[in-house]
Curated annotation (Swiss-Prot):
PROSITE patterns: FRD_SDH_FAD_BINDING. Keywords: Electron transport, FAD, Flavoprotein, Membrane, Mitochondrion, Mitochondrion inner membrane, Oxidoreductase, Transit peptide, Transport, Tricarboxylic acid cycle. The keyword rRNA processing does not apply. Its cofactor is FAD. In vitro, can complement a SDH1 disruption and leads to less than 15% of wild-type SDH reductase activity probably due to its lower expression level (compared to SDH1). This is Succinate dehydrogenase [ubiquinone] flavoprotein subunit 2, mitochondrial. Probable minor catalytic subunit of succinate dehydrogenase (SDH) that is involved in complex II of the mitochondrial electron transport chain and is responsible for transferring electrons from succinate to ubiquinone (coenzyme Q). Probably forms a catalytic dimer with SDH2. Electrons flow from succinate to the FAD bound to the catalytic subunit, and sequentially through the iron-sulfur clusters bound to SDH2 and enter the membrane dimer formed by SDH3 and SDH4.
């Protein structure tokens, strides 16, 4: 009890749930097929909405729903502020006009061009129009943006961004918190989630969607702390689980980026979209893959080859080092192939920052100065950083409308069809605002704009507190059977061996440059790796804090994403954005301006491919005209 004034006391009994919510119903134990028989304790919960993932997109959706009065559960396999959003460095795009006059329509033009005309223009219209409002909202929540001398939000230059629809030179549109923007955003959003009493279930590993007659009705999850299984009933299930960068050997992604939500959706019989488009960031630290933000080039850094040449002037005469990421990554790869790489093996290039004033490095780039020292042994004030293109982002994911509703294809009409009960946002989703190539600093924007869109859509379509329909008592038991099979796997291959084989295959065969031969070999190799999962060995048979089990379940998810990535890439016979074919060197809008949809029900099953049209119109053509396809040059 806290004494406020004489005779007045206040009791603080505010409940915030971090590991479990009040149990709605605990049902009997379920026997497994293992010998001796094991038992799984299943606990049922009922919520209006459940959000899977507690990064930027998941938190924004979750607290938006809680704030609107919905009983909301947020599941995360790790503590929310350890989500991969924390690693985003450079900033968040919005046409605030703090450094020069700017217009969100120019931002839209740059995003469509950056997507290589594969982005859906209704969603891009919505995102860029909402961007200024979203950034100001973050500021009001307390996000500590860097400031100009007159107190406005500081904005830096980033790749692929221009003034006046590509005619006015480099735009300064990226709002930054030094080089730790994602860290600041994640903590800001987490604070709002706590304020609005979101129910958190932390260190719960979501295994599968619960479906009933084609409708998603919740998720089933494994509580790593006590080994119990939890079924979460929900009228709306939101997937915000991030990307699957760990399918590759060298990536900037956290070890937790394993495509869990994508694989859950795939196992439920729904499609994934555009998985062939994997972004390679131009500046991962050579040898470790740690990210050096594009903001380093935005502040004036530049790339050098072994001859000391600023080679980007040959590949992108206007934008130079601030061309879009796919262009810069290909240029670096071509320099290395031409023998102009640096180092003993001539297999990387250099990022020069030592010419920048020390105060700029200290104020604007403190994090990467430390990262370069720790992971490359480099003092950025004295010497360049060795860098190499590194897997960074998945443009593909769960096909989603700009409202956040997940999509599939109607078997009879071939038209888009909303999946009842399922929504997605963030890197797990494919809205598609990034198309074939994401612009730097559009990812943090994507998180908050579409996380909020999910909450708004649900608020417009669902009444809080509605009762749940009765379901079969054995719903989710197929997922438990898979958990039991994996936990008791007694094969000859360690999880780490299979994972390494997958990562090496993807790194070699589905990389920056692709040909039909390498892609076909990649499909064969990843299919063989996929089959070896049946021979996996899990040493730890327990249910409590079993990291061996969790990593094996994550590998199962990664294999689903990796296989569909390789197959989708082998089918697309053109070069567009991050998908660069040496045997089909040009973009083909007539035959290939369309989204790839892929289905795969489970590990070691065939991948089915279909296509859906790119949305070439905006939300309101009187407000904003669509951007017609054109030659993409920087």
């Amino acid at each position: 009890m806290l004494s406020l004034k004489k005779g007045i006391t206040k009791s603080y009994i505010l409940q915030r749930t971090f590991t479990s919510s009040s149990v709605v119903r605990q049902i009997g134990e379920v026997k497994s097929e293992s010998k001796p028989p094991a038992k799984y304790h299943i606990i049922d919960h009922e919520y209006d909405c459940v959000v899977v993932g507690a990064g930027g997109a998941g938190l924004r959706a979750a607290f938006g729903l809680a704030e609107a009065g919905y009983k909301t559960a947020c599941l995360s396999k790790l503590f929310p502020t350890r989500s991969h959003t924390v690693a985003a460095q450079g900033g968040i795009n919005a046409a605030l006009g703090n450094m020069h006059p700017d217009d969100w329509k120019s931002h839209m033009y740059d995003t469509v061009k950056g997507s290589d005309w594969l982005g859906d223009q209704d969603a891009i219209h919505y995102m860029t129009r909402e961007a200024p409002k979203s950034v100001i909202e973050l500021e009001h929540y307390g996000m500590p943006f860097s400031r100009t001398e007159d107190g406005r939000i500081y904005q830096r230059a980033f790749g692929g961004q221009s003034k006046d629809f590509g005619k006015g030179g480099q735009a300064y549109r990226t709002c930054a918190v030094a080089d730790r923007t994602g860290h600041a955003m994640l903590h800001t959003l987490y604070g709002q989630a706590l304020k609005n009493n979101t129910h958190f279930f932390i260190e719960y590993f979501a295994m599968d969607l619960l479906t009933h007659n084609g409708e998603v009705v919740g998720v089933i999850a494994y509580n790593q702390e006590d080994g119990t299984i939890h079924r979460f009933r929900a009228h709306k299930t939101v997937i915000a689980t991030g990307g699957y960068g760990r399918a590759y050997f060298s990536c900037t992604s956290a070890h937790t980026c394993t495509g869990d939500g994508n694989a859950m959706v795939s196992r439920a019989g729904f499609p994934l979209e555009d998985l062939e488009f994997v972004q390679f960031h131009p500046s991962g630290i050579y040898g470790s893959g740690c990210l050096i933000t594009e903001g380093a080039r935005g502040e004036g850094g530049f790339l050098l080859n072994s001859e000391g040449e600023r080679f980007m002037e040959r590949y992108a005469p206007t934008a130079k080092d601030l061309a879009s990421r796919d262009v810069v990554s290909r240029a670096i790869t071509m320099e290395i192939r031409a023998g102009r790489g640096v180092g003993k093996n001539k297999d990387h290039i250099l990022l020069q920052l030592s010419h920048l004033p020390p105060e700029v490095l200290k104020e604007r780039l403190p994090g990467i100065s430390e990262t370069a020292a720790v992971f490359a042994g480099v003092d950025v004030t004295q010497e360049p950083i060795p860098v190499l293109p590194t897997v960074h982002y998945n443009m593909g994911g769960i096909p989603t409308k700009w409202t956040g509703e997940a999509l599939t294809i109607d078997e009879e009409t071939g038209e888009d069809k909303v999946i009842p009960g399922l929504m997605a946002c963030g890197e797990a989703a494919c809205v598609s605002v990034h198309g074939a190539n994401r612009l730097g600093a559009n990812s943090l924007l994507d998180l908050v704009v579409f996380g909020r869109a999910v909450a708004n859509t649900i608020a417009d379509t669902l009444q809080p507190g509605l009762p749940h329909k009765p379901l079969a008592s054995n719903i989710g038991h197929e997922s438990i059977a898979n958990l039991d099979k994996v936990r008791n796997a007694r094969g000859s291959l360690k999880t780490s061996q299979i994972r390494l084989n997958m990562q090496r295959t993807m790194q070699k065969d589905v990389s920056v440059f692709r040909t039909q031969d390498t892609l076909d070999e990649g499909v064969r190799n990843i299919t063989e790796v996929d089959k070896t999962f049946e021979d996996v060995h899990v040493s730890d048979k327990s249910m409590i804090w079993n990291s061996d089990l969790v990593e094996t379940l994550e590998l199962q998810n990664l294999l689903t994403c990796a296989t569909q990535t390789a197959v989708s890439a082998s089918k697309r016979k053109e070069s567009r954005g991050a998908h660069a074919r040496e045997d089909y060197a040009k973009r083909d809008d007539v035959n290939w301006r369309k989204h790839t949809l892929s289905w795969q029900k489970g590990t070691s099953t065939p991948v089915k491919i279909k296509y859906r049209n790119v949305i070439a119109h905006t939300l309101d053509e009187n407000e904003c005209a669509p951007v017609p396809p054109a030659v993409r040059s920087y």
